Amino acid sequence: MAGARGCVVLLAAALMLVGAVLGSEDRSRLLGAPVPVDENDEGLQRALQFAMAEYNRASNDKYSSRVVRVISAKRQLVSGIKYILQVEIGRTTCPKSSGDLQSCEFHDEPEMAKYTTCTFVVYSIPWLNQIKLLESKCQ
């Protein structure tokens, strides 16, 4: 009888330990903390387009740049939505006056090709139709 009771206590302790370990995974993500966002997310795409328009507007380059690839993208719910983006951008063959950058090819001549990694932080309040570039750092 004592052996059976010991097994039940041991089994209950093991189940509690497994529950605590599995439950801690859900608790590690804090409310309001940045979370990964899918690259195809509509809000992310708007934020990225806005960040690139601001980057090109501030750039002294004769040519426009556009995103080569998204390295990482996170979304944080604050009093709006903050997008934290790390992207690789490249110089295109299109002058700044061009409208549609997606159809612009990247320079392939070594002296003209320029690739840079940038971090953009974009703050969006979609229900007020407001968007602002909070941070733009490129290396």
Swiss-Prot record:
GO terms for molecular function: cysteine-type endopeptidase inhibitor activity. A motif (Secondary area of contact) lies at residues 76-80. InterPro entries: Cystatin_dom, Cystatin_sf, Prot_inh_cystat_CS. It holds the Pfam family Cystatin. Gene3D superfamilies: 3.10.450.10. Disulfide bonds join C94-C104, C118-C138. Residues 1-23 form the signal peptide. The record marks G32 as: Reactive site. This protein binds tightly to and inhibits a variety of thiol proteases including ficin, papain, and cathepsins B, C, H, and L. Although isolated from egg white, it is also present in serum. This is Cystatin. The lineage of its organism: Eukaryota, Metazoa, Chordata, Craniata, Vertebrata.
